[in-house]
C-alpha cells in the first residue's frame, strides 16, 4: 500500500511538471513566432501535444530514476527551436528569452488567485489545496531554476 501511495503521489507532480515545461517551451516558440520567426511553427513545435517536446532521457528516464531514488523529480524537454536572426529587435530577443519564465509565473499567479477565491468561499478541500499548492510550487521552481545564468537555462 505504501508503494502505491508513493506512486500515486508522484504521478500528479510528474504530470504538472511535464505540462508546465511544455507550456514553458511553447511560450518561447510562440514569442519567437510573434517576433517574426517561424522556425518552431514550421517544425510543428507550437503545440501542447507532449510528444514533439519529449526528450526520452530528460522527460522520462531521468524523472523516474530521480523519483524512485530520491523522491523528487528532475528533468527537461526538448527546447523549442528558434532562429535569433529572424527576430526583429533586441527587445524581441529578450521577449523570447523571458517568455517561458513569465509563463511559469503566470500559471503560479493564476493558480494562486483561484486558490484564494476558493479559500474565501470555503469550498477548498484539503486535496484540492494540496494539488493547487503543487502547481504553484512547480511553476515558481521552474521559473527560478530557469533564471540560472548558465547554458542552456533562460538566464543566459
Question: For each predicted feature, which ranges?
Answer:
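Hydrophobic transmembrane alpha-helices and their immediate loop junctions
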Residues: 1-156
Amino acid at each position: 500500500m505504501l508503494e502505491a501511495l508513493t506512486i500515486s503521489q508522484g504521478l500528479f507532480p510528474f504530470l504538472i511538471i511535464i505540462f508546465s515545461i511544455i507550456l514553458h517551451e511553447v511560450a518561447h516558440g510562440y514569442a519567437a513566432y510573434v517576433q517574426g520567426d517561424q522556425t518552431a511553427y514550421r517544425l510543428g513545435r507550437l503545440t501542447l501535444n507532449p510528444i514533439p517536446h519529449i526528450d526520452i532521457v530528460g522527460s522520462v528516464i531521468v524523472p523516474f530514476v530521480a523519483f524512485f531514488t530520491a523522491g523528487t523529480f528532475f528533468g527537461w524537454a526538448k527546447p523549442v527551436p528558434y532562429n535569433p536572426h529572424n527576430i526583429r529587435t533586441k527587445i524581441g530577443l529578450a521577449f523570447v528569452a523571458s517568455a517561458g519564465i513569465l509563463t511559469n509565473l503566470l500559471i503560479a499567479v493564476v493558480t494562486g488567485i483561484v486558490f484564494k477565491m476558493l479559500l474565501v468561499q470555503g469550498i477548498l478541500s484539503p486535496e484540492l489545496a494540496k494539488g493547487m499548492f503543487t502547481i504553484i510550487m512547480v511553476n515558481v521552481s521552474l521559473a527560478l531554476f530557469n533564471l540560472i545564468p548558465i547554458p542552456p537555462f533562460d538566464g543566459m
